[in-house]
Regions:
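Predominantly extracellular/luminal cell-surface or secreted proteins
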Residues: 252, 374, 403, 444-446
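Zinc-dependent metalloendopeptidases
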Residues: 1-309
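Well-ordered beta-strand positions in beta-sheet-rich domains
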Residues: 103, 259, 341-343, 386, ...
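Short, surface-exposed loop/helix-turn segments at secondary-structure junctions
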Residues: 266, 275-277, 412-422
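Low-complexity acidic/polar repeat-biased segments
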Residues: 290, 294, 302, 306, ...
């Protein structure tokens, strides 16, 4: 979605109220009108970090890039918004030094209908159009267009990834079929990445410990308790950019099975009823998620979200390369830390906890919990990479699952470990033993028969382990 045009220095904007503000002929001479208050507010939401409350900041171009916006003169501003009958729909001019550069024009083809450009509300066609045309005025090209730097790859050519494409869903043939409030509520990940490539990334916005929250009944997006996005219907369809700090997605109000993925470029679903209906595509016609994560800017991990507070149903939560804190709360949850030194807390229910790489802390909570380990590298003998289970309770049917690890790679197939209790390694490949101290237990596995541990798991309690406590 990159073009060959961008602004330099402060980007000024204006909402002219008189045709005489324009030095060129054409649009101004064909039913000129000033934009509505709703259009003005939508434009300010998308541009200005200082518009409204601080909750909006991260969703504005000024908030996620280093571009600086300021109110300018109606005759000379870089980006100007107005209405004309000349474009039947809407269009905008790229940045430049020519007279029309940066001007955004909205037509009247949909006047008096639900798609009227004068009535943008987060998630409707008019809102989407304003984001799209502002993108052009700042230097973004069409996502479906092979000009300039090429079109979006086919697997990303949908409004789930960019407001700049005409493709409503993967394979839509450059057409929109979404429901009335089924459009993106913000710039999406490809747009954010392109604008950051042009203007730099702002890591000061929401650089503290920010809490993002969504309401199951209305779809409102809250940032640190203040409403940032008030959609026209109970739909959530946005991308989050966060500048730094230790940040949290608080989804504790949800009673539906959450599907959360904190990895860059991935999407999370809070409630299927809050998914935007796109009219087709690989997810039964719906958007693949409610909230999408921004891509990393040049590999900088400060924009990652670190923590998740789950709901009361059966949640699936995947972390990222940061040190995540993931709390499942009630329900039979599946928690995965991905990379980083994570804290996974299942809460009430029969949970599965998979720390992944890093020295992870695993808390199953009440219920029959399963602690999964899938490779030797995920829990090392060295403390720097060793996982700790804090509440292994055999009487609650907690189990340690090693079944994915091949205990003997010299034999075809996935071999199971042989549990030898507290006995020393004998030199057999695939032996599993444990040591119990006064208040700790250490589990060791030898996969190559050299009588040395190849991985270790720490239990924060003295437990007399038995073969039945493992899934081998």
């Amino acid at each position: 979605v990159l073009s060959n045009a961008a602004w330099y220095g402060t980007i000024t904007y204006a909402f002219p109220t008189a045709a005489g503000s324009y030095s060129y002929s054409g649009e101004k001479n064909s039913g000129f009108a000033a934009v509505s208050t709703a259009q003005k507010n939508a434009a300010l939401f998308a541009m200005e970090q200082s518009f409204g409350s601080a909750a909006n900041d991260g969703f504005s171009v000024e908030g996620f890039t280093n571009a600086s916006f300021a109110l300018g003169n109606a005759s000379t501003a870089s980006v100007r918004f107005a209405q004309s009958k000349l474009p039947s729909t809407a269009y905008a001019y790229y940045p430049g030094t020519y007279a029309e550069a940066g001007d955004v024009w909205f037509g009247t083809a949909y006047a008096g209908t639900v798609n009227d450009y004068r009535t943008p509300v987060a998630g409707n066609y008019a809102w989407h159009t304003l984001l799209h045309e502002l993108g052009h005025a700042l230097g973004l090209s069409h996502g479906h267009d092979p000009d300039d730097f090429g079109a979006l790859p086919a697997q990303y050519n949908s409004i789930e990834f960019s407001v700049m494409t005409y493709s409503g869903f993967i394979g839509s043939g450059n057409a929109y079929w979404y429901e009335r409030f089924g459009a993106p509520q913000t710039f999406m990940m490809a747009d954010i990445a392109a604008l950051q490539e042009m203007y730099g990334a702002d890591f000061t916005t929401n650089s503290g410990n920010t809490v993002y929250k969504w309401t199951p009944g209305s779809g409102a997006t809250l940032v640190n308790g203040a409403t940032a996005i008030a959609p026209g219907a109970n739909r959530i369809f946005a991308t989050v950019w966060d500048g730094g700090g230790n940040d949290t997605y608080d989804l504790s109000a949800y009673r539906t099975g959450l599907k959360i993925d904190l990895r860059p470029g991935q999407a999370s679903t809070f409630n299927a009823d809050q998914l935007a209906y796109l009219g087709g595509g690989p997810n039964d016609g719906f958007a693949r998620g409610n909230i999408f994560n921004a891509l990393l800017y040049h590999g900088d991990t400060r924009s990652l979200i670190e923590n998740v507070l789950g709901g009361s149903a059966n949640d699936s939560i995947i972390g990222n390369q940061a040190a995540n804190t993931v709390r499942g709360y009630a329900g039979n949850d599946a928690l995965s830390g991905d990379r980083g030194n994570d804290l996974l807390d299942g809460g009430v229910g029969n949970d599965s906890l998979y720390g992944g790489a890093g020295a992870d802390r695993l808390v199953g909570g009440t219920g029959a919990d399963r602690f999964l380990f899938k490779s030797l590298a995920e829990t090392t003998v060295a403390t720097t990479g060793r996982d700790t289970i804090y509440d292994f309770v055999a009487s609650q049917s907690d189990r340690i699952d090693l079944s994915t690890i091949d205990a003997n790679t010299t034999v075809t197939g996935n071999q199971a470990f042989v549990f030898v209790g507290t006995a020393a390694f004998s030199g057999g490949k695939g032996e599993l033993r444990y040591d119990r101290a006064a208040s700790d237990t250490y589990i060791y596995g030898d996969v190559n028969g050299d009588r040395k541990a190849d991985f270790a798991i720490h239990l924060d309690d003295a437990v007399a382990m038995q073969k039945g406590y493992f899934i081998l």
